[in-house]
Design a protein with these regions (language model features):
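PLP-dependent amino-acid enzyme catalytic core
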Residues: 1-453
Length: 453
């Protein structure tokens, strides 16, 4: 598979070059020259296939010729030691993406990426320096995924005071080859700093650089896997391959035959890498009817879907902090594959306030006993609004639950009481934070990187 920049389709690179470079030299994002199709037998079996088998079939065409079939098999089975179960809650599914080591959906992409990088760089002596901007969960997942990986050093930039105490310990509590910089600014500032550093010619001569944000195609592609797995189960209603029957909705069809309910997947969205991965799954042949892109008050893309005009803005802080993005990077990828008219047909945009988010967390727990984190609650409320507006009808609905609610206990527990805490998160709170504070200034960041390396 060849990849080209969203800003120049005339020059292409292979998967290894796209992944290890991260950002194209012209500042664009790498996209595949074509989005491959699942073989017919895979399309019809998504509802019953093992998660790692779906991962293998999804990723294989993107890395063909560079990662052998046996190596890819080893990578996906080492990366995906956890699943993405569908849980029936009221009239919809919760697609739980928080069963990885840092309890966030970012674990899927980060763990694959770390193992793929190790394979692609085998025999390489020069260290690789990875820069990553985070609004919360990406930093923790990347830090965990790359922790103690030989020959790779990671620097995580996060907005000071805008991540939770637990997120900060995941980002800045590991040490060894993981460093953290607390930036006096927003996530958008962190993202711009990373892009500027990756484009700096002097820095590139000094060290091998890459990024682990969703601007890196190798982190985005594996996220398509859970879309195909979830849509396959939701559309087909087949038993879970791990032995537990997938809960069914009222009126739900039991096989993928004409008349089965179309699938709507709601994606809590900020930087729009997650939704872009879903669009890849759709184009590959996953049985997805449409998406709902649910944002907080940082609603750049919902406004674009309404008007056709793309206007970035300064991000505003909310309780769903991982989605506090006013200039989503992956919008470039979306427009590389889809026109505005095409997006309008398959993506419903909706925004949700903090007040609505809090009410949703409390109401869903009171009615069902289910715990939602603030981001997943944005998705839940977004679906409620779209149903009231008659934009979603007769659909099997899945909410992508992107983080464990215990990661946001400061917001959630006052609304619903104590939350069961996974052992991995309880252990994380014992770490000490070790981060250097810097201003949102490119020369300061570059000087800091020179000092560290």
């Amino acid at each position: 598979m060849q990849y080209y920049s969203t800003r120049n389709s005339n020059k292409s690179v292979n998967f290894a070059q796209a992944a290890l470079t991260g950002l194209a030299p012209d500042g664009g994002l790498f996209v595949p020259k074509e989005i491959p199709q699942y073989p017919a037998n895979v399309k019809t079996s998504l509802g019953t296939m093992d998660f790692c088998d779906i991962a293998y079939e999804t990723i294989k065409p993107y890395v063909e010729g560079e990662i052998s079939g046996s190596a890819l098999e080893d990578i996906v089975r080492a990366a995906f030691t956890f699943n993405a179960p569908l849980i029936s809650v009221a009239d919809r599914y919760a697609v739980e993406l928080f069963h990885g080591p840092t309890a966030a959906f970012k674990d899927f992409g980060a763990r694959f990426m770390a193992r793929a990088f190790s394979f692609l760089r085998r025999g390489e002596d020069r260290p690789l320096h990875i820069l990553v901007a985070t609004s919360g969960d990406t930093g923790g997942a990347v830090a965990d995924g790359f922790f103690d990986v030989p020959g790779i050093f990671v620097t995580v930039l996060y907005p000071k005071g805008r991540v939770t105490p637990l997120q900060e310990r995941q980002i800045a509590g590991l040490g060894k080859n993981i460093s953290a910089l607390a930036v006096e600014g927003s996530f958008d500032d962190c993202q711009q700093l990373v892009k500027a550093a990756l484009a700096d010619e002097g820095l590139k001569k000094r060290m091998a650089l890459s990024s682990a944000n969703s601007i890196n195609i190798s982190r985005l592609i594996p996220q398509a896997v859970y879309y195909s797995a979830a849509a396959g189960k939701a559309f087909a209603g087949f038993p879970d391959p791990d032995g537990e029957a997938t809960p069914r909705l009222a009126g739900y069809k039991t096989s993928a035959v004409p008349g089965a309910l179309p699938v709507t997947l709601c994606v809590p969205s900020g930087n729009f890498g997650n939704l872009t991965a879903g669009l890849y799954a759709l184009k590959m042949g996953a049985p997805i009817h449409q998406f709902a892109a649910a944002t907080n008050i940082n609603k750049t893309v919902p406004d674009y879907l309404d008007s056709g005009e793309y206007l970035t803005r300064i991000s505003q802080a909310t309780i769903s902090n991982a989605m506090d993005v006013g200039a989503p990077s992956n919008f470039e990828r979306m427009t590389a594959h889809f026109s505005w008219d095409e997006m309008k047909r398959i993506i419903l945009g909706v925004s949700v306030s903090d007040e609505e988010t809090r009410k949703t967390i409390a109401q869903i727990h009171e009615k069902t006993g289910y715990f939602l984190d603030p981001h997943s609650a944005v998705g839940w409320k977004g679906i409620d609004k779209l149903i009231l507006e008659n934009k979603i009808k007769n659909s099997a609905i899945g909410i992508l639950c992107t983080a464990h609610p215990a990661k946001f206990s400061e917001t959630v527990e006052p609304l619903v009481g104590p939350i069961p805490v996974p052992a991995s998160l309880a252990h994380t709170m014992e770490r000490n934070v070790n981060a250097k504070t810097i201003p949102a200034d490119v020369p300061v960041l570059i000087e800091t990187l020179y000092e560290k390396n």
